[in-house]
């Protein structure tokens, strides 16, 4: 079964956390729980940050974040309430002195990390939240989180597009050891929202099984709350990089019912970056992939074979291979990969049911 992948990841996690300690960030010890929970979808609960008097006005009107901003100050910003900690990897303890410009030290396996993009992301979140928008949604109920505390470290960050527009769910990688949202899903979601789409970045529990359960729950949550969120889940897409690409592919192939939820429609398209996934089920959805030739983790030749096999089964699939790029290049801004997201969005649009 695909989730034997977790066994190897347990070993990798131990090694990685040791390495991060040397770099100045040590492991937090968030535990994975692979038992399924099939109880109901969490209802939308509007999170508000109480503001009163001059102190609150000062907090809301504080200066924009910069590359010199300390990560702990961003996490603790009152405008983010108690979900600020989920903006950065919760599986690493972050040194109090670490600034945004040093963010690469808590993003192992990634390349082309741009602190200025991280600044844009956190300021976008701050401005939206201080303007009264709800930017974070729990996918599990309080009862579910009480029964399984690991579910406290899950949820969806909402990057709003146009009201009633199509929806995308973006899943960051991190080797199923941590969630690299600040580099591998938030930037993608922000760019998709600029195109008018409603984009959600999932924070999930590391571990292949729990990650897929959380993605299945996220899909269920969005379907159940589409009217309140003012989104269109018809022809939604699943995006992901590295481990997140595996999640997107597995949900696309197996569906939500395989991971403890009722059966919901499968995505119109799966968008994958730099993953070594090679297993073909025959149930793949239309798939776009991109990878660099310099990737020492996800072989571009393996990805080419994967996409070719999907096409051989009669399903639309496309791959872009970028010369010289390493693993985890994200948006690839300023590289030969810049613009891949535009191509991926076009692929998604081409495979929407309304366009068939």
PLM features: what roles do these ranges have?
Residues 213, 217-284:
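Primarily recognizes the serine-hydrolase "nucleophile elbow" in alpha/beta-hydrolase
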Residues 289-291, 295:
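Short beta-strand/loop motif that positions the catalytic acidic residue
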Residues 296-302:
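Conserved alpha/beta-hydrolase "acid-adjacent" motif
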Residues 180-182, 200-229, 334-337:
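Catalytic nucleophile-loop/oxyanion-hole region of alpha/beta-hydrolase
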